[in-house]
Amino acid sequence: HWLELEKSLGKKGRMMSIQEADKQSANPNFAKGKEFTINCQTCSPAYVLREWGFNVTAKGNTKGSLSEWISHGRSFEVWENLDGTKVAPVFQKDWLSSHGYKQMTEKRWAEYFEETCKEEGTYILTIGWKGGGGHATILKRTKEGLFYIEPQCYDEAVGAKRPISELCKDGGSVVRGSRGILRVDDKKFLEKFLSIFEKGS
């Protein structure tokens, strides 16, 4: 599927490390305007494509843009399985129900992350915060364990691999239907959404 992306994005380079794909490089304009502070739904796939070796960055989330459309609970709609079938995220509401839980707690968030992200790979998470509002971000399972990667805004003090405990503490107890986790390193990014990225030189 990379060959199709190369037609639009140019030839991909070598696969990037976590640090190269992250470190504010997926969203370099974060400090330049509000639209780059509310574009998490674009930063997350930008990070994934960067891991694959494509030099892309996230465009801002402006009114009427494709990024705005994705931000309304559609983060998983930009992906499909390699055989062209629809993806199946592990939605938080379904996970709670299958465990007989009514709502999330700090401990249950950790359980959900660990259970859903068992295999080594890159995952997109959509989550609601305790104080309201939502976020799309990256979970990464490596040989060392499970990490939280924040492609929208890099924190030099914390580094690229952040502890998932940050998300467990801040995750809201009530979950919304469209929020969940999807493994994406083994998926196809749909070409019709490529305009949400800026192409690097």
What residues fall within each predicted segment?
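Glycine-rich catalytic cores of cysteine/serine-nucleophile enzymes that process amide/ester linkages
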Residues: Q152-V158
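Glycine-rich short-loop/terminal segments
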Residues: H1-E119, T126, K130, I181-D185, ...
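Short small/polar-residue motifs
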Residues: A110, G133-T137, R176-G177
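Catalytic nucleophile-His microenvironment captured as a short glycine-rich beta-strand/loop
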Residues: T122-P151
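Noncatalytic regulatory segments and standalone regulatory/sensor domains
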Residues: V158-S201
